[in-house]
């Protein structure tokens, strides 16, 4: 046999318009399913009776760790993407602020350069401090 499709007996023949499938994208195929952050957080015994602040910090650390490479670092490009997807409500409306533009430009420079957790948290807190959402949070009443 020549190896062409018509002469190979074990070759499956597909229609021109195959039915859509619900399979995972090829990049995710074979990858273990990620455990939700809430379940990861719940599995940390020391935080069973943790304060809201402790749990908030642990959540930020878990989000970072789930995206970091085996050495515990993120590229600047990955950092920018993570902040834009996981911190979008804090970033919203900041696009024209000079400090925000400066921070994003710094992430765009040498996008493959790696940053550690400390630098990530500094970026996270800096973006939160710039945010219009922070003022809204400050205005929330904590008592009746």
From Swiss-Prot:
<feature type="compositionally biased region" description="Low complexity">
    <location>
        <begin position="18"/>
        <end position="29"/>
    </location>
</feature>
<dbReference type="GO" id="GO:0005929">
    <property type="term" value="C:cilium"/>
</dbReference>
<dbReference type="InterPro" id="IPR034325">
    <property type="entry name" value="S-100_dom"/>
</dbReference>
<protein>
    <recommendedName>
        <fullName>Sentan</fullName>
    </recommendedName>
</protein>
<feature type="region of interest" description="Disordered">
    <location>
        <begin position="1"/>
        <end position="31"/>
    </location>
</feature>
<dbReference type="InterPro" id="IPR013787">
    <property type="entry name" value="S100_Ca-bd_sub"/>
</dbReference>
<keyword id="KW-0969">Cilium</keyword>
<comment type="function">
    <text>May be a component of the linker structure that bridges the ciliary membrane and peripheral singlet microtubules.</text>
</comment>
<keyword id="KW-0966">Cell projection</keyword>
<dbReference type="InterPro" id="IPR011992">
    <property type="entry name" value="EF-hand-dom_pair"/>
</dbReference>
<dbReference type="GO" id="GO:0048306">
    <property type="term" value="F:calcium-dependent protein binding"/>
</dbReference>
<dbReference type="GO" id="GO:0046914">
    <property type="term" value="F:transition metal ion binding"/>
</dbReference>
<dbReference type="GO" id="GO:0005509">
    <property type="term" value="F:calcium ion binding"/>
</dbReference>
């Amino acid at each position: 046999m020549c190896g062409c499709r018509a002469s190979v007996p074990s070759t499956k023949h597909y229609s021109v318009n195959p039915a859509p499938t619900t399979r995972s994208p090829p990049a995710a195929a074979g990858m273990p399913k990620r455990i939700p952050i809430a379940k990861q957080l719940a599995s940390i015994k020391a935080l069973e009776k943790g304060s809201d602040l402790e749990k908030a910090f642990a959540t930020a650390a878990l989000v970072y760790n789930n995206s970091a490479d085996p050495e515990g670092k993120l590229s600047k490009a990955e950092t920018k993407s993570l902040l834009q997807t996981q911190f979008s409500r804090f970033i919203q409306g900041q696009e024209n602020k000079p400090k925000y533009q400066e921070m994003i430009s710094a992430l765009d420079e040498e996008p493959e350069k790696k940053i550690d957790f400390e630098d990530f948290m500094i970026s996270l807190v800096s973006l939160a401090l710039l945010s219009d959402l922070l003022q809204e949070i400050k205005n929330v009443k904590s008592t009746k």
